[in-house]
Amino acid sequence: MVSKSDQLLIVVSILEGRHFPKRPKHMLVVEAKFDGEQLATDPVDHTDQPEFATELAWEIDRKALHQHRLQRTPIKLQCFALDPVTSAKETIGYIVLDLRTAQETKQAPKWYQLLSNKYTKFKSEIQISIALETDTKPPVDSFKAKGAPPRDGKVPAILAGLDPRDIVAVLNEEGGYHQIGPAEYCTDSFIMSVTIAFATQLEQLIPCTMKLPERQPEFFFYYSLLGNDVTNEPFNDLINPNFEPERASVRIRSSVEILRVYLALQSKLQIHLCCGDQSLGSTEIPLTGLLKKGSTEINQHPVTVEGAFTLDPPNRAKQKLAPIPVELAPTVGVSVALQREGIDSQSLIELKTQNEHEPEHSKKKVLTPIKEKTLTGPKSPTVSPVPSHNQSPPTKDDATESEVESLQYDKDTKPNPKASSSVPASLAQLVTTSNASEVASGQKIAVPATSHHFCFSIDLRSIHALEIGFPINCILRYSYPFFGSAAPIMTNPPVEVRKNMEVFLPQSYCAFDFATMPHQLQDTFLRIPLLVELWHKDKMSKDLLLGIARIQLSNILSSEKTRFLGSNGEQCWRQTYSESVPVIAAQGSNNRIADLSYTVTLEDYGLVKMREIFISDSSQGVSAVQQKPSSLPPAPCPSEIQTEPRETLEYKAALELEMWKEMQEDIFENQLKQKELAHMQALAEEWKKRDRERESLVKKKVAEYTILEGKLQKTLIDLEKREQQLASVESELQREKKELQSERQRNLQELQDSIRRAKEDCIHQVELERLKIKQLEEDKHRLQQQLNDAENKYKILEKEFQQFKDQQNNKPEIRLQSEINLLTLEKVELERKLESATKSKLHYKQQWGRALKELARLKQREQESQMARLKKQQEELEQMRLRYLAAEEKDTVKTERQELLDIRNELNRLRQQEQKQYQDSTEIASGKKDGPHGSVLEEGLDDYLTRLIEERDTLMRTGVYNHEDRIISELDRQIREILAKSNASN
């Protein structure tokens, strides 16, 4: 056992945050994860300074703590923005705490900046402290008396007054259940489970404009059960979603009444279909039907709410999606069950198979029971039977599709060596008698007499002139079923090809032996080209088809024939053709991406002899077994001659061999039939699957096109209405145009008439004006003469006025008036200067008062500091007084003498200043008396006296000076002297 002192608590205090943006519709949550255990704070408002004020603690002993510190186990805190409406969590950032910084002594909290912060414009920070505390939890008693549960039918008074909004689910980690309601009264145990069983028509949730991740998008269902986020296993196929039904269960401790109230508040369970962090659709399952008022079903058996619920797209996608018909609506099969703990039930969900008897909203689906775990592993590749030589080869598109599928199968699984044995290798033993296109058609193959034995070889030499901007690891792949095998032929290993380089391909030579008629060979070569696919093989991702090269095999038929001798001495013919063909891009525009150099050879070995070819089940390939009659044995013994022929060992061995051959033929035929049946079944299932996929896609497209057709019909009707409106507007425009034309002609005629009349009026007016001008010329001459006479009179009068003005300026009254004007201007200027000086003086007094107050404060502070220094010096001097008394007395005498000299000099200086001020005041007073105007001097004395009194009062109000100060005494003396002078003058 671990001692009590070894039990510790790792306490992480999450206090507050700062530099967060304001999001009123969101909440902030911080989740902390350590050693696989996750804790979270309560949601707080998403403000700029959120207040968390939460402590999160993990129990640990010292040994485990030491181990975690050695391993540098971090404590990761993730901050989320929570949407209370949709319960969607949005990652904001995270913080990583080092466990080694936690100490048992209390440490000051620190600010930690969020890493990978979503709010890039804000440097969001959270104040956190981490510490170790001794676990002081009281020991758990092995036995405690528990309160008896309330009797049925009686609700305690405390529950009757409980606010329904205060009923929440609280996780009890020690007991492993959620407590709903007061723990002392709600003691019944329940199990609540949610099962997602199936889903259909999910492709309807994805609009045509939406883009999904390119590489295997994963879809899953998400829901929150009592605050626990639950997701099912991801699946990739939306058209045929294949996933195992999963049940999520939680234990609840409550009572029936409280649980009913809680379910009434949390009335709906929302389930989302997600792809990554994006919700494609959601549905709501009502929970109020689990516990109906007054019902006691839950005491006898589990209560359930189940069915196929329609998935609705989110608001942002609903605007882009067209309305979906009811029969094509996406649905999800969900069952929510609630039962008392301890009641035995076989299954909380009973999934039924309903065909024609089910209601309208269920779409004839077979729901898989929960107990059945339908494994969805990779399917084994289906090997289609090899067509015989008289079957028509597939078209180009079909061949390409089958080749892509077979390449995927080759990547996923390794083919059975018996099922996909090398056809050329097995037929090489037949020399010139086997037909490669008839390997899988039966055990006995009849070759027509007109068929020739051909050998076709192809050598893909090199890839050059690459036009792709990145290096590729290329392999070449092709298939030509006419040669007897639909299996793809590939080069291996992949070679790296870069731009402006030529790379020779390894293992690129392949030869095919087959029997066919020359005209059929020529017809096939003319119709069907050989498609060579260029693939980029990537270890980190799926292989990529880059392009396809088309090799026209008919070119070899027009090449020159050369004669050679076969292995049996017969005359044979050979044709060879070499060429470089472009590789066309598989996607996008038909641009050349590379060039492929190849060499093909066709050898004709002549007619195939009429015979039957037997195919055995040997793993070495196909072999023809021909028994020739053995020659007579030399010198037989008499005992051997008398023995029956059927009893000889040779006959028995031959008989056993024939029986074994027949048995092997039967076994091989059965195996072929079983393989054919399995392959046909797999092919049929795949065909049905693809047919269903195509049918669902066609239905979806038909629904979309129907909606588009309706829109087009509506648009067409609108266009017809618009055309009619335009026609009516055009006719109205023509009518108005004619009216405007006639109006224009009428206005033009009126304008011509008015111009003619205006011309006549103008001619008459010109004649009148000419007469007026002649009259005005005469008046002008007369007035010009009068003007000359008036100018002469004006000059005479102006000269007389100038003489009179000069006479008036010489008089004294005029000169005095001008001086008065000048003095008035000077007076105004002096008054302005006086007012400015008065304002400056007042400002100076205010500044001087402030300076005096500041000086008093500084003086007081200096006195206090001097007193403190003096006290300190006195203490020091008291200690040294006895030792340095004589020297100190001498220094004191010198210092006092110096101070007396300084005081004497200061007194002399003050006396001189007083004398100077007295002389100035005397001069002022005498000057005022001796002036020509006595009243003006008295006014100057009064002003000077007033100024002195104001200065004295101002200095006294500052609090720095008193009546004993020298400057105040001097001001009082001057005031008394001026008062005495004024009294004497009076």
Curated annotation (Swiss-Prot):
The keyword Repeat applies. Keywords: Ciliopathy, Coiled coil, Cytoplasm, Cytoskeleton, Disease variant, Joubert syndrome, Phosphoprotein, Repeat. This is Centrosomal protein of 120 kDa. Its main location: cytoplasm. Residues 350-424, 914-937 are annotated as: Disordered. It is linked to Short-rib thoracic dysplasia 13 with or without polydactyly: A form of short-rib thoracic dysplasia, a group of autosomal recessive ciliopathies that are characterized by a constricted thoracic cage, short ribs, shortened tubular bones, and a 'trident' appearance of the acetabular roof. Polydactyly is variably present. Non-skeletal involvement can include cleft lip/palate as well as anomalies of major organs such as the brain, eye, heart, kidneys, liver, pancreas, intestines, and genitalia. Joubert syndrome 31: A form of Joubert syndrome, a disorder presenting with cerebellar ataxia, oculomotor apraxia, hypotonia, neonatal breathing abnormalities and psychomotor delay. Neuroradiologically, it is characterized by cerebellar vermian hypoplasia/aplasia, thickened and reoriented superior cerebellar peduncles, and an abnormally large interpeduncular fossa, giving the appearance of a molar tooth on transaxial slices (molar tooth sign). Additional variable features include retinal dystrophy, renal disease, liver fibrosis, and polydactyly. JBTS31 inheritance is autosomal recessive. The lineage of its organism: Eukaryota, Metazoa, Chordata, Craniata, Vertebrata. Changing A199P: In SRTD13; also found in a patient with more complex ciliopathy. Plays a role in the microtubule-dependent coupling of the nucleus and the centrosome. Involved in the processes that regulate centrosome-mediated interkinetic nuclear migration (INM) of neural progenitors and for proper positioning of neurons during brain development. Also implicated in the migration and selfrenewal of neural progenitors. Required for centriole duplication and maturation during mitosis and subsequent ciliogenesis. Required for the recruitment of CEP295 to the proximal end of new-born centrioles at the centriolar microtubule wall during early S phase in a PLK4-dependent manner. Interacts with TACC2, TACC3, CCDC52, TALPID3. GO terms for cellular component: centriole; centrosome; cytoplasm. One of its GO terms (biological process) is neurogenesis. Residues 377-394, 915-924 have a biased composition (Polar residues). SUPFAM superfamilies: C2 domain (Calcium/lipid-binding domain, CaLB). Residues 669-925 form a coiled coil. It comes from Homo sapiens. InterPro entries: C2_dom, C2_domain_sf, CEP120-like, DUF3668. It comes from the Eukaryota. Belongs to the CEP120 family. The modification Phosphoserine is found at S935.
